[in-house]
């Protein structure tokens, strides 16, 4: 999908040597923008830490504390080491979703390449964590509880695990791309007031999709940490 009006449209010219599509160039440009915004926001929130937080530091502590509590409630205390991964992916997805509600900005998560990249990171991290925890014994997760059914269960489990990044990719992409298309249509028909309800719904959809992505990330990692039976 090519957005009709973008502030960073000039990036398409800069990325022409890479032979990217216009939609792909838009996704790359706004992905970089979001990474810079997150880095800048984090720097401003932590450059002058105080015992009694205020302003951006207070907001950041609320966000970090909320994500940390969600990880502990979902995975237990042993989930704390995976906070950087879960929080980074979650915040990136959330900001990517929300930025599309600003006219002239494109949500990178409305491009399937961005959602696939996030899903692949989660997929690889899940199995790296599992192998690190269990070593060669991690293969038991794919064999099932009955020895003579192991070959069949292995095949089924492999398909199930490969479907995880696919479902993460398509769920997020489908929701955000669909919402972006509806907004473009509404803005084309009646640019004032009419798109407002869809934009408000977009805020809710953005938070829900980011929450679901984070929750599934935690569930997948938790599953790789458990002992196989």
UniProtKB/Swiss-Prot annotation:
It is found in: Cell inner membrane. The chain crosses the membrane at residues 25-45, 86-106, 111-131, 142-162, 181-201, 202-222. One of its GO terms (molecular function) is proton-transporting ATP synthase activity, rotational mechanism. GO terms for biological process: proton motive force-driven plasma membrane ATP synthesis. It is a multi-pass membrane protein. Pfam families: ATP-synt_A. The keyword Cell inner membrane applies. One of its GO terms (cellular component) is plasma membrane. InterPro entries: ATP_syn_F0_a_bact/chloroplast (IPR045082), ATP_synth_F0_asu (IPR000568), ATP_synth_F0_asu_AS (IPR023011), F0_ATP_A_sf (IPR035908). Keywords: ATP synthesis, Cell inner membrane, Cell membrane, CF(0), Hydrogen ion transport, Ion transport, Membrane, Transmembrane, Transmembrane helix, Transport. Key component of the proton channel; it plays a direct role in the translocation of protons across the membrane. Belongs to the ATPase A chain family. F-type ATPases have 2 components, CF(1) - the catalytic core - and CF(0) - the membrane proton channel. CF(1) has five subunits: alpha(3), beta(3), gamma(1), delta(1), epsilon(1). CF(0) has three main subunits: a(1), b(2) and c(9-12). The alpha and beta chains form an alternating ring which encloses part of the gamma chain. CF(1) is attached to CF(0) by a central stalk formed by the gamma and epsilon chains, while a peripheral stalk is formed by the delta and b chains. This is ATP synthase subunit a 1. It comes from Pelobacter propionicus (strain DSM 2379 / NBRC 103807 / OttBd1). The lineage of its organism: Bacteria, Pseudomonadati, Thermodesulfobacteriota, Desulfuromonadia, Desulfuromonadales.
């Amino acid at each position: 999908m090519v957005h009709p009006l973008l502030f960073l449209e000039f990036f398409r010219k800069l990325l022409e040597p890479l032979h990217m599509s216009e939609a792909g160039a838009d996704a790359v440009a706004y992905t970089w923008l979001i990474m810079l915004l997150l880095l800048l926001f984090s720097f401003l929130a932590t450059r002058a830490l105080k015992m009694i937080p205020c302003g951006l530091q207070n907001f950041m502590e609320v966000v970090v504390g909320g994500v940390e509590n969600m990880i502990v409630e979902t995975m237990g205390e042993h989930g704390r080491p995976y906070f950087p991964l879960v929080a980074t992916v979650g915040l990136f997805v959330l900001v990517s979703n929300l930025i599309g509600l600003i006219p002239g900005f494109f949500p990178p998560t409305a491009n399937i390449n961005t959602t696939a990249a996030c899903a692949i990171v989660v997929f690889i991290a899940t199995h790296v964590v599992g192998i690190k925890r269990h070593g060669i014994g991690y293969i038991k997760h794919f064999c099932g509880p009955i020895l003579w059914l192991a070959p069949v269960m292995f095949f089924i489990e492999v398909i199930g695990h490969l479907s995880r990044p696919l479902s993460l990719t398509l769920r997020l992409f489908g929701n955000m791309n669909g919402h972006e298309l509806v907004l473009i249509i509404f803005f084309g028909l009646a640019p004032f007031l009419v798109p407002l309800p869809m934009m408000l719904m977009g805020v809710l959809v953005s938070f829900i999709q980011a929450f679901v992505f984070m929750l599934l990330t935690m569930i997948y990692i938790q599953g790789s940490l458990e002992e196989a039976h």
